[in-house]
């Protein structure tokens, strides 16, 4: 019975005296009557529409459904009686009990007569809700102890639901004296059993010390659960670790959230005894130290993970402004210019990132399956092309954004980890980056530096948007409805035009999950270099003086709200004409990719599959969502196809020999291909031949010598042949 009779935990109200316990019963009765009047008489409505008794009707409806709880809004209580609301804010532990007793009495009145078998009146749980501005975990100090607080955050761990006694019965082992119906304080509060038996011992031997034990079958218990709340990522100061807070939920508040949920908590800021620093407790170091937790009285959950908390704060004036913005004929260009305006160029990439931020429409099919609406994007190419800067901007711009680096991210850190709870010694689950970013964007930098095992772990999260865990006896599925924006470098550091697909070191399984793949090259163009240098110098010179945004751009805060508003309010679908057009174009794309593979005599590392068809649908829906339109038009499909063409399709069709220096024409590429085929026919795998004789034979066939050297160089880099005997002989490996 160690869970019931642990004497090492103290409740916050018992810390510092029994002043509250000495208050008169008359005052409590009066306050309870006032709470009862509030629940019975509070009305909503107008003279024209008629009045309804809000809480009285809610109590009756919930009770008849077998749900013994009611949610009270603090603003309603304040409008009815400010003193009552003030008492509840400053001394919630005492006054919440009076409010629950009042709710039980009102429920008794409104549910009479009850059906046979249900005559026993059930206890009512009161949950609290408030529209007040929330505090942060960092702002909770000792002067707020035992007060009502409102805290936002992310649930990162949840324990199993367990039982806690609210009323216990104890019995003496020696004389069988029984004490029944002993009330327990709520929260993480234990009960210290009496050390001595208080019965009359006349004519009987004295009972020994510590004679009482708990009778579990005569205890009244409720469910309880402990949660771990973490600060929101955008509330953590730079360079600091996010802080955590333990939460205690009971009764109907259990199992309302899972790791990864963004929540706002209403509760009592309480304390419990800090763990002893020595194993046996001989040195009672830290006797006066208490650790804090929150006894939860209400939970508001961002259920769909789409930034609803942001959209809920949109005023009617802002809504009208957003609708005017969406109605602009060039809203697509305005938004794309607002994506990282300090970065020069990359227009198509910025347009693609704008589509990623808005996302497509998530669809639930009749058979229960879902199709993701979030867009995944990969930027692949040279260093110094502002890939990481774009990632940082998207993290700030997205309503929910998590930034991580590939080298410092493990599979468990990205998905979810199972660890042992230090208090209960049970296994609990903590969500990783992709769970915490549910409803937002995960930005993964240095994607190519990740270990292959860790990269495979996010396959399911990217396509099915769930994370399935089967570890340490825990088998569950977490939501990770987020977009992935990844940046990676070429295998050789810089993009080497002579190596074609060898620059890409990713498996087709991961590449097919990206809706758009941009190959970013640092091209040497004098005119572009002049403009780029001018732009960068201007940024550095005017960094201290330029405070206003460039003409025609949307500022970051407004853009962030507009994205959240569109994601919640709009879920467009393809129109019939757009769907027909897309079907025809997809067939042409597939046949073009197949013809390219046949001509180049090798499969592309970037496949064109049905996933890419769905990608174009999502891009078209995102373009429609920017305009708050219910259907994606043919123009949206045309732009989606263009974006797909300049990104993934161009990357997939970049053949092995395309773009080689000095061989840009189709005829030259065909010549190189012919040389390679003849060379492979010339000597089999495992055989060797003199390099000098190879060059001599091909020059006799009127092939240019530099072309023969280029083919040999390409085959050497691909590992198909290797030099032997002081680079005089070529040996074929594959």
Curated annotation (Swiss-Prot):
<dbReference type="InterPro" id="IPR054125">
    <property type="entry name" value="MCM5_C"/>
</dbReference>
<feature type="domain" description="MCM">
    <location>
        <begin position="331"/>
        <end position="537"/>
    </location>
</feature>
<keyword id="KW-0067">ATP-binding</keyword>
<protein>
    <recommendedName>
        <fullName>DNA replication licensing factor MCM5</fullName>
        <ecNumber>3.6.4.12</ecNumber>
    </recommendedName>
</protein>
<keyword id="KW-0158">Chromosome</keyword>
<dbReference type="GO" id="GO:0000727">
    <property type="term" value="P:double-strand break repair via break-induced replication"/>
</dbReference>
<keyword id="KW-0347">Helicase</keyword>
<dbReference type="InterPro" id="IPR018525">
    <property type="entry name" value="MCM_CS"/>
</dbReference>
<dbReference type="InterPro" id="IPR027925">
    <property type="entry name" value="MCM_N"/>
</dbReference>
<dbReference type="GO" id="GO:0030174">
    <property type="term" value="P:regulation of DNA-templated DNA replication initiation"/>
</dbReference>
<feature type="modified residue" description="N6-acetyllysine">
    <location>
        <position position="396"/>
    </location>
</feature>
<dbReference type="GO" id="GO:0000781">
    <property type="term" value="C:chromosome, telomeric region"/>
</dbReference>
<keyword id="KW-0547">Nucleotide-binding</keyword>
<dbReference type="InterPro" id="IPR012340">
    <property type="entry name" value="NA-bd_OB-fold"/>
</dbReference>
<keyword id="KW-0007">Acetylation</keyword>
<feature type="modified residue" description="Phosphoserine">
    <location>
        <position position="315"/>
    </location>
</feature>
<dbReference type="GO" id="GO:0006260">
    <property type="term" value="P:DNA replication"/>
</dbReference>
<keyword id="KW-0225">Disease variant</keyword>
<feature type="modified residue" description="N-acetylserine">
    <location>
        <position position="2"/>
    </location>
</feature>
<feature type="modified residue" description="N6-acetyllysine">
    <location>
        <position position="392"/>
    </location>
</feature>
<dbReference type="GO" id="GO:0005524">
    <property type="term" value="F:ATP binding"/>
</dbReference>
<dbReference type="GO" id="GO:0071162">
    <property type="term" value="C:CMG complex"/>
</dbReference>
<dbReference type="InterPro" id="IPR031327">
    <property type="entry name" value="MCM"/>
</dbReference>
<dbReference type="Pfam" id="PF00493">
    <property type="entry name" value="MCM"/>
</dbReference>
<comment type="similarity">
    <text>Belongs to the MCM family.</text>
</comment>
<dbReference type="GO" id="GO:0003697">
    <property type="term" value="F:single-stranded DNA binding"/>
</dbReference>
<feature type="modified residue" description="N6-acetyllysine">
    <location>
        <position position="696"/>
    </location>
</feature>
<dbReference type="Pfam" id="PF21933">
    <property type="entry name" value="MCM5_C"/>
</dbReference>
<keyword id="KW-0539">Nucleus</keyword>
<dbReference type="GO" id="GO:0005654">
    <property type="term" value="C:nucleoplasm"/>
</dbReference>
<dbReference type="Pfam" id="PF17207">
    <property type="entry name" value="MCM_OB"/>
</dbReference>
<keyword id="KW-0242">Dwarfism</keyword>
<feature type="binding site">
    <location>
        <position position="371"/>
    </location>
    <ligand>
        <name>ADP</name>
    </ligand>
</feature>
<dbReference type="Pfam" id="PF17855">
    <property type="entry name" value="MCM_lid"/>
</dbReference>
<dbReference type="InterPro" id="IPR008048">
    <property type="entry name" value="MCM5"/>
</dbReference>
<dbReference type="InterPro" id="IPR001208">
    <property type="entry name" value="MCM_dom"/>
</dbReference>
<comment type="function">
    <text>Acts as a component of the MCM2-7 complex (MCM complex) which is the replicative helicase essential for 'once per cell cycle' DNA replication initiation and elongation in eukaryotic cells. Core component of CDC45-MCM-GINS (CMG) helicase, the molecular machine that unwinds template DNA during replication, and around which the replisome is built.</text>
</comment>
<keyword id="KW-0235">DNA replication</keyword>
<dbReference type="Pfam" id="PF14551">
    <property type="entry name" value="MCM_N"/>
</dbReference>
<dbReference type="GO" id="GO:0016020">
    <property type="term" value="C:membrane"/>
</dbReference>
<keyword id="KW-0378">Hydrolase</keyword>
<dbReference type="InterPro" id="IPR033762">
    <property type="entry name" value="MCM_OB"/>
</dbReference>
